[in-house]
Amino acid sequence: MPTFYVDETGFTGEDLLAADQPIFVQATNDFTASETQKIIDSIFSDVGASELKHNNLSRKPAHRERIVELIRLATSDPKHVATWVAHKEYAAVTLVVEWWIEPLAYQSGLNLYKDGANHAMANMLYMCLQGFWDERFRRKVLLAFQRMFRARTKERFDECRNLIEKAKDAVLLDEYRSEILRYLWPSFELLGFEHVVGLPQHVFDIALPGLVRLGLSWRGKHEGPWEVIHDRSSNMAKQKWLWDMFSSADIEPAQFDGPHGASIFPMNVINTRFADSMAEKQIQLCDLIAGATSASLRLPEGDEYHAKLFDAGIQNLIIDSIWPTPDVSPEELGKAGWDGNKVLEWLSEVAAKKKAPVQG
């Protein structure tokens, strides 16, 4: 039975604005125990570490070379390895669109999931909040929304509302800045504090969406059934019940042909468990790949390690991402004719049948 191993790096829970960890990466592989041991023996035999961890190995140039060799091996036959990455500050923007702007648009009869309008909105806000103000202002706005969505208190609601209204009043004579803020302030009046209180729990936690995307990628390669083994130290255990719901083999079949290929249900996962990386060494390889992917995205282009990772093809392991671009048209986004609302409606039906709430 195929088994997929998963580990992550850069997870900070619902705090997507931690300056020291701007990137979140999940990595997965389906190497067998014998294949994994062969990889470790052939590449890392001279490392002398009881456990292979990217944070430790990447400190020494010689060990970085070993990691690059692992990436080169993975990209030579990429069907065994996949990564999913998220730019966490941009992810915060997408969640403001998802839980603050889209609900009001829906009430007004607009479908932001059609033709990737939600994606375009997030790109526009991310670029314009910095372009028309600065990076500091964008982070200040996102931090206020993050605090509001996490605390769900009237104090945090008023704090966020006052920030946006003060910014709006300061640019009344500036047509362009006023237009940007017009996407943010109406929900305070028209949705109100009750909307914030009624949101699902953990809406700023992006670990589950990444794992689902990886799961759908594997489902496209293997009909299943299959097993998932996640690192025991992962916080995914908190949302295992929701993962189990959408990955199980007993939900009704469905297929959604989207911009990144087909999403096929059921995923046919018959078991998900959390294991010690010392016992399941495939998890150690996931840690190395996730850490290297994060480094390749964080380090400047002139950095030697960055250059070697890209030369090894690490970018080719990324199957999907939450990442900002200046693209806003359906054609640029690759979402012309795509209606993401159909997937959400189906997921809501699945959750309703299982009598469990949908989370974003």
Name each region found by the language model:
Residues 1-360:
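Phosphate-ester processing/binding pockets and catalytic centers
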